[in-house]
Design a protein with these regions (language model features):
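Terminal domain-initiation and capping elements
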Residues: 1-97
Length: 97
C-alpha cells in the first residue's frame, strides 16, 4: 500500500515527464524517402515552414540524423507517430538534463 507522500511523489514524477519540454523528435537519414517527401512531412506534421523543413532535411541527409522538433512528450508523441506512419525513420527521445 502506498503512503500519501509516495503517491504524491509518483504522480509528480509522471506529470513532470509528460509536461517536460525536454523531449525531441530525431529524424534519421534513410535511402527510401525523397527530400520532397521529408520536407512535405515536416511542414505538415511538425509545423515547419518550407525553408526550415528544407534545412532540417539537408541536416538529416548530411549528418545522418537531426533533431527536428522539441517540446513535451504529450505534444510530440502524435507528431512522432504520424512521421512513422508516413515511412520516416524517427525516434522520440528524452533529452538529458
Amino acid at each position: 500500500m502506498w503512503s500519501t507522500k509516495e503517491l504524491e511523489a509518483e504522480v509528480e514524477a509522471i506529470l513532470s515527464e509528460k509536461i517536460s519540454k525536454n523531449w525531441t523528435i530525431v529524424l534519421y537519414n534513410d535511402d527510401l524517402n525523397t527530400f520532397d517527401w521529408v520536407i512535405e512531412c515536416l511542414v505538415k506534421y511538425c509545423g515547419h515552414d518550407t525553408v526550415q523543413a528544407e534545412q532540417c532535411a539537408w541536416f538529416v541527409h548530411t549528418k545522418g540524423k537531426y533533431a527536428v522538433k522539441f517540446g513535451d512528450k504529450y505534444t510530440l508523441k502524435p507528431i512522432y507517430e504520424a512521421l512513422l506512419e508516413k515511412g520516416l525513420n524517427a525516434a522520440l527521445e528524452q533529452n538529458k538534463s
